[in-house]
Amino acid sequence: MNDMTAMDSTVETQRTKIAAKGVNVYYGDSHAIKDVNVEIEDKTVTAFIGPSGCGKSTFLRCLNRMNDTIDICRVTGDILLEGEDIYDKRVDPVQLRAQVGMVFQKPNPFPKSIYDNVAYGPRIHGLAKNKAELDEIVEKSLRRGAIWDEVKDRLHAPGTGLSGGQQQRLCIARAVATEPEVLLMDEPCSALDPIATAQVEELIDELRENYSVVIVTHSMQQAARVSQKTAFFHLGNLVEFGPTGQIFTNPEDPRTESYITGRIG
């Protein structure tokens, strides 16, 4: 897949998976995200780009309430998953995170076997009635993480013994094991070498057949390669959102053009 593949592809009209309406995020008195409105489409890769500190990772963490773990963080506005408010008091954040999975910047396999890393979520959420069903989920997830062939003969070896790229693909397999609807990725390739990065990017393109994928990246080349939609954040504002090809070749806002051409960053 080259830089222009995702940019040049025609995006079919997709239904909205996540809708954010008037979202603001505060860390104490600091206003980190300012009145963001955006719709994330189903079975589409959406990239969040922008300079360091622009708010893209903060907003990403709003989408599965990871910011709940920060005492001084306050979120206002509405974020709807399939039309349901994820910040409703009746929503269980643990269950939400099974629906909206997360892959972090640094690979973080649990100090468990490869098998138990992937089986952890299905066990917690009661997704398997017996060992045979759990085995099936683990294999299916490792295949979706594009790592099954590399680990199928050592499933009981520690996940931490894998290479960095393998660990990140294991974390992706772990995230999809609970059958999420959305997969969030916060700089998933920043700690990986170019070969491992290419493998993860190829995997992201495959994952969108089954999931909505939202990726935060500092690499504009990566955003161009893997995404169909791109959102540009600057100083806590969502400056521009649209088809990736348009954002990179014909942006409407001068701030977007300045970032794309390297004049701000």
From Swiss-Prot:
Topology of the protein relative to the lipid bilayer: Peripheral membrane protein
Domain ABC transporter: 18-260
GO MF term (any one): ATPase-coupled phosphate ion transmembrane transporter activity
Cellular compartment(s): Cell inner membrane
One cellular-component annotation, GO: plasma membrane
SUPFAM superfamilies named in the record: P-loop containing nucleoside triphosphate hydrolases
Catalytic activity field: phosphate(out) + ATP + H2O = ADP + 2 phosphate(in) + H(+)
Complex and partners: The complex is composed of two ATP-binding proteins (PstB), two transmembrane proteins (PstC and PstA) and a solute-binding protein (PstS).
Designated name of the protein: Phosphate import ATP-binding protein PstB
Organism this protein belongs to: Ruegeria sp. (strain TM1040) (Silicibacter sp.)
